[in-house]
């Protein structure tokens, strides 16, 4: 039995709730309302796509590479902001970006549901003296997704 079933179900529920909510937003709301990191809703959603993509890659690598594994941590030293800028999420087609985010998460769920349970304690070196297990990586994904969706919710409700 996969220990991440509830987490996967929660991600599916968030996708169901948020896809239509995101697609209903105006251009002004998705482009001009900024969080404390000066990110628009477009940019936050792009970051969430990057998160789904990078975490999927980590899960795959952690099942076959040396342990502990060295793997780039895109979220440190401002790199996630570089990813947002280089990919120009601020000007990405909104419908396409929402679908990209949705389907990246559906694939993430598929990968998590098929993870080799014997590899859950494999680790990657995410920083100096910082090791994160495959289990911790998977368990940390949903709270990160929820944090940023709540942030988007706050921006939507800001007048």
Give the predicted meaning of each segment.
Residues 1, 13-15, 27-32, 77-82, ...:
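Short hydrophobic/aromatic-rich motifs at helix boundaries and adjacent loops
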Residues 1-6, 39-56, 80-98:
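Charged, low-complexity, helix/coiled-coil-prone segments
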Residues 1-29, 50, 54-61, 140-143:
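Alpha-helical bundle segments that constitute or directly flank the non-heme di-iron/ferroxidase center
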Residues 2-9, 65-67, 91-99, 128-129, ...:
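Solvent-exposed interaction patches of small proteins and small membrane subunits
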Residues 10, 14, 21, 80-120:
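Acidic/histidine-rich alpha-helical segments that form the ligand environment
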Residues 24, 47, 114:
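Conserved catalytic core of Hanks-type protein kinase domains
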Residues 31-80, 109, 123-159:
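Short, contiguous alpha-helical
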